[in-house]
């Protein structure tokens, strides 16, 4: 895991992935491409600030040496984007474009932060799940040496701009965890830090040639196991 690239590094999961990678002394370089500077800093960080997302594919291609692993936690909300059509351009189209650019550049592993709903029966009907499913299918079709799909349920984390109704949902999920045990909470949602760590842990396992499959999907139980139970600082 000599060199890594984090897309969506200013978001709730992407920023967690970035912080985790920057704290890892075994990683020589951590690149980011974003519209604004990430909050985390460190001697191994190489941040590219580019407001024009149509240039991100070219920026990715220009990173030398080519990152061994690319993480994408890239995404927005319908409210922030100004509607489903604009959200689709980021959550689906930009992710697809960057996955294609990563494959063309020779990236070995691609890690995508998806959603639990992308694997459900309604994934073809719910707009958000449909976006994520489309990206997953593209990544699978690109045939990376290693693809890792992370499917968290409710993301238990504070956001700069809260999703509509998210604070209430997060509060209710944590309350159920207090009342009925952490096991129930783990099924309903995962802490943002745990999700980020699970993504990094899975990539490390893959780099060691120990991934269970070439196209590895992490569901809620896998996220908790890799990001908390088996995690070692």
UniProtKB/Swiss-Prot annotation:
Residues of the transit peptide: 1-36
InterPro entries hit by this protein: Epimerase_deHydtase, NAD(P)-bd_dom_sf
Predominant place of localization: mitochondrion
GO biological process: import into nucleus
Pfam families documented for this protein: Epimerase
Localisation: Mitochondrion outer membrane
Cellular component, GO annotation: mitochondrial outer membrane
Keywords assigned: Membrane, Mitochondrion, Mitochondrion outer membrane, Transit peptide
Lipid bilayer topology: Peripheral membrane protein
Assigned protein family: Belongs to the FMP52 family.
Protein name: Protein FMP52, mitochondrial
Organism in which the protein naturally occurs: Chaetomium globosum (strain ATCC 6205 / CBS 148.51 / DSM 1962 / NBRC 6347 / NRRL 1970) (Soil fungus)
Gene that this polypeptide is encoded by: FMP52
């Amino acid at each position: 895991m000599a060199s890594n690239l984090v897309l969506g590094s200013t978001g709730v999961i992407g920023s967690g992935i970035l912080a985790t990678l920057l704290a890892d002394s075994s990683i020589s370089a951590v690149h980011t491409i974003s519209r604004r500077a990430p909050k985390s800093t460190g001697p191994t960080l190489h941040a590219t600030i580019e407001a024009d997302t149509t240039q991100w594919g070219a920026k990715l291609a220009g990173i030398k040496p080519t990152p061994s692993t690319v993480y994408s936690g890239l995404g927005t909300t319908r409210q922030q984007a100004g509607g489903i059509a604009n959200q689709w351009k980021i959550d689906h189209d930009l992710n697809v474009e960057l996955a294609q650019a990563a494959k063309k550049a020779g990236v070995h592993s691609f890690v995508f932060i998806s959603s639990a709903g992308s694997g459900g029966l309604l994934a073809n009907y719910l707009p958000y799940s449909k976006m994520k499913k489309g990206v997953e299918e593209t990544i699978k079709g690109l045939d990376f040496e290693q693809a890792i799909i992370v499917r968290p349920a409710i993301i238990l984390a504070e956001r700069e701009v809260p999703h509509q109704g998210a604070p209430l949902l997060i509060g209710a999920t944590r309350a159920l965890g207090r009342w009925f045990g952490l096991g129930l909470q783990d099924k309903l949602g995962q802490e943002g830090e745990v999700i980020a760590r699970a993504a990094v842990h899975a990539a490390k396992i893959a780099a060691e040639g120990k991934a269970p499959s070439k196209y590895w999907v992490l569901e809620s139980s896998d996220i908790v196991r890799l990001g908390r139970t088996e995690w070692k600082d």
